[in-house]
A protein has these predicted regions:
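Canonical Radical SAM [4Fe-4S] cluster-binding loop centered on the CxxxCxxC motif
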Residues: 1-26
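A C-terminal junction/extension of Radical SAM enzymes
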Residues: 183-186
Length: 186
């Protein structure tokens, strides 16, 4: 899906409203899986991203279940890159069952994260992310995070490190700002 419910200040894709978005269909998903399974690679990683991939969770389920039903010889890993704002208990159970690893974004302390990553329908994305990370921990689902650096972030290096430690993250993947879309002036 290219739909996203977030309005990140540095979005390179720029947020799409639901009425202008495109969702992957089962037909395209099946063709994509079949194509990947015919590759010479012995190991594959299917990564779900977007937009916000959880907005099309039914297709994620379809891809994983279809792949597992037809795959006979490849090692398949699944991963998800998401803001996690749409995460439900049903999704957690599914990701746990199929060993889906998860990556999200954590840009720093509460004020910095909320400044960078506002949701269109939720005032405090930092607190919401903290709740979803706690659920992932409770369910032993592997997760990681990416920190997108903007000029404002440079004032808070220790605070960013502290946030990652407090959230149980042992590594910080720092992504510099790419000057595309809304990110041009950040």
């Amino acid at each position: 899906s290219n739909y996203c419910n977030s309005n990140c200040i540095y979005c390179q894709a720029q947020s799409n409203q639901l009425n202008s978005c495109k969702m992957m269909t089962k037909e395209i998903a099946k063709k994509s899986v079949d194509f990947a399974l015919h590759s010479p690679q012995k190991e594959l990683n299917f990564e779900f991203q977007g937009g916000e991939p959880l907005s099309n969770f039914e297709i994620i389920k379809y891809i994983v279940e279809y792949t597992n039903s037809v795959n006979k010889e490849k090692t398949i890993q699944y991963s998800l890159v998401s803001n996690l704002s749409l995460l439900t208990d049903e999704m957690i159970e599914f990701f746990k069952k199929y060993n889906v690893s998860i990556s999200t974004s954590l840009d720093g302390h509460e004020l910095l994260h909320n400044y960078n990553r506002p949701l269109s329908n939720y005032p405090n994305t930092y607190k919401l992310l903290g709740k979803t990370i706690a659920k992932l921990k409770e369910n032993n689902i592997p997760y990681g995070a990416i920190q997108t650096t903007i000029k404002k972030s440079l004032k808070y290096p220790q605070e960013i490190i502290n946030e990652y430690r407090e959230k149980g993250l042992n590594n910080i993947f720092i992504r510099p700002l790419t000057p595309l879309g809304y990110a041009l002036d950040k």
